[in-house]
Structure formats: C-alpha cells, structure tokens
C-alpha cells in the first residue's frame, strides 16, 4: 500500500529545508559547512639554541688564554671592568721571574650585546727569550696600581740554530752605521708599539703564500758569518718562505695598511694593522701593490715576493708583532686571536 500523500509532502518539505537524511545522520562536527573545532595546542618548548640565555655569571674578573703559553705565543687577557669610572688607561703586563716585566699592552673594549658583561681585552706575546716557569698577568690602572693578578706557567720550548754566511754587500747592511737605517727603525718601532681601538679581524690568520717550503722558522737562533771572518748573532723574528721572485703575497687577515715603502735592510716592506697592537709584516718584496692607509681584506694581494734588502735569495719574510713583541705566526693560524665567548666561559668557571 502506498504512503499517504500528506506524509510524502511533509517529507519533501523536510529535505528542501536542509533536514538530515532519515537513512544517515552526519555528526555535526563532520558537516562540510561547519568549521572544524581546533583545540589549543600545548605550548611547545623552544630549542635551547634559540632561547635567549641570560649572561653568564662572572665568578672571576680576570681570564687568560691559553693557560700554559710557550715562548713566542700570544696571550689574550680578558678583564671584567667594575662599574666605576676608574676603568680608563688600563694595561696588562706579563711578569716573569724576579718580577721582571716581559711584555705590556693596553686594554680595549670588546664589542658585545648591550646587556651583557662589559669585557675589555689586551693581547700580549710571550717573548721567545722568556724562561720557562712561573709567571703572572697583572692588570694595572693608569697610575700603575695593580687591580688584579692571575698566575700561569710558561712552558718550555726549544728553537733551532742556523748559520748564515753573508757577502760583503749584506755584511755592510748589517754592520755599517747609517742614519737612514736608524730613522727607518725608529719610525717602524713607533708604529708597532701603538695600540689603537680598531678591530679589523678576530682571526684566525691564514698564511700569506700558498707554499709549504720554509727556509727559516720563528725563533731561530742565528749566527751571521761576515765577509771579514767576524760574526754576529740575532733571533729570527718571523717565518721565511722559500718562494721564487714574483710569487703573489696576500694579506693574512683583514687589516689596514700602515706602512708600504722600501727600507734599507728589509727591502720593499708592507705592514698591516689587524687588532689593537697586533700587526703583520711582509719583507723583501719585489713589488708593492698597496698604498698606506688602505683597508685590505684577507687574501688580497699586497705585492710580489723578491729578494730586496738584506736577503741571500728570493723569499718572503712573514712576521707578527704584538705590542711591539715578536710573536710566532703559526700560533695565529691555529686559533682565533680574540674569542670573547671563550673568555666569558673562563670567567664563569
């Protein structure tokens, strides 16, 4: 028997009005026209490396890296400056046996976050002649008053010896007095003992030539045999690379050219400033290709190697000075010269 007509009419009106099918009832949350309900997600943990960490707690105001330096190696001194006005003119000194000062340098500001600890740094070099044993680093104010001290031990180190015969021309370069040599020496010395505030690089440095052949090493104890049979001694201040004339010589790090000119003893010479009191030197060049005052990027060509000045053959003499003191170039290629994070870790131990 067919359903009554009034029932069918009512059923049609129900579907036209959007009513649910009598055969299937879709859950309300599954309706296409109903937006899904989004439950609030649990707060996710931010990766530790992305969180803003608080500044480290300073437990000791003075830190020195490395802890057991060898003769010829640089020392980076970090000092947490007290919140006082008496923090200008600070200097760091390396004191050896019998209280003898081995080297000294001025502090400079290390750039950092505005809310972080205020750290100053000074870079020293352990002289190649320093005796092994107990030593200390002392922080002094402008009046010479000691503000902080830290003990350390200078490690032992052996240096090679070499004998170099000189012809008459090179003998004269070393032994005959010349006011021009004196003036050139005084001019360069004034530059190398100057400590400014410019930080051009943090290091590490890179060698200035693509050659592994070395003819002399840092700290070599030299004996010069002069043409008349007499002799003289010196300590080699850098590294000599046995490269042919015309080899490209490049900057070991970013820096500013503070000297680019011929000199009597060292021939065509270039000097770069990299950090306050830290300089690299390039001697005996055949050509100079930079000008004084220019800013140079690491790897830029400074000139070409040669044999100008007091040289027994073509080579490049590469030297590093720290507050006027000779320093081993290899130490500067091994690690950064200025590492604020390492200093802060040391201060927080």
Name each model feature, range by range.
Residues 9-18:
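Bacterial N-terminal signal peptides
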Residues 24-159:
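Cationic-aromatic interfacial patches
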Residues 248-258, 289-305:
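Short, well-structured beta-strand-loop connectors
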Residues 218, 258-264, 300-314:
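Flexible, gly/ser-rich surface segments that form the specificity/activation loops bordering the active-site cleft
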Residues 252-289, 314, 319:
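Zn2+-dependent peptidoglycan hydrolase active-site motif and core
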Residues 159-193, 200-201, 291-300, 319-349:
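Acidic, glycine-rich catalytic/binding loops that coordinate metals and/or anionic ligands
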